């Protein structure tokens, strides 16, 4: 089969994608994922075909330039490009940060670690639970027949299916939420989640670990597509007119949507508030606002009198964000002394997995974005986070979702090339395929047909990176 034949086959698949209801079936057809194959889920070894490594390398080298060329050709301000940059930034951060997880702070060059086997034995370029759960969330959104809403039953089902597939990594809070999950008895259409919700709330309510935040990239992408005009109105009005009415409405809407996802594993109300503030940062980045404008939006929101009328949780977080931003603006602020010094309450290693570390790191890099050279910005930011050790994969993932769209895929630089260069089996390209299909789904579910003409070319590239000459019925 020649390249033209491959392109025609994939074009047929793309044509089928005009109906959003069959997206999940297309995913299962192409990648053989589904509940009928427990143990072969997402990042499992068994999900990939047995490919000759030499042939894979040959195919990879031949097609790598196609993928890079596609990325460089995209319009910087297209929604497709921006959403993809967000998810790709999160996934790349996860894959690279995983090599430094659970390590203590060190100013030494952490790249030496790449020569060793990380704590969870993942391969270079392999994503961990952060990105896998984000993909599960994307599946849940695509499978839900009510396209205008988020359904906790579908989210619980896909998270649970993943949790029972023996993933390489899973946090304690998440694991606890799915200890009683059963493939056989649970089906999302039966609204079964309400039967286990109280038990999860009782067990996990006190958890403020970062697991709820690390998976948000795909949900935020859905929100950007779903509430595009409301987001633009809210941001433009607060930036240009200092009017926060629409921004506050957006904040409450994001809290409501985030709650549907958070209650699956992290039912504490504080997680909804954190998710709202974080989502506003990511949405601002996807909209291609300058970092200082994103900071202005946050400060306008947090300083609004609205929060004095809210509960203690909203008010506390708003005041904390104002305080952190002012701290990070100080030119004498010492990054490593603040985040790396043992014994400090801010030490990333000491309080490993706490959501507040990731939130503060995201704020820090937004405030100081302009101090980095664009060419090496993504690399330098991940360098700094990885050097802190602790829960490095999740911190890099959460920060990466914001930084990705701000710098654009063409500026991922050495990190992007490094991840592509070291893939011995193609778990990472597989996740890129899922990202492409999900972003296309978001377009079609909103009946917005302004999709890039060469998206099929891109999907062909990433699929042939994995399979060489492929058969798609």
What is each of the regions a protein language model found here?
Residues 2-473:
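Structured, active/binding-site neighborhoods that engage oxygen-rich ligands
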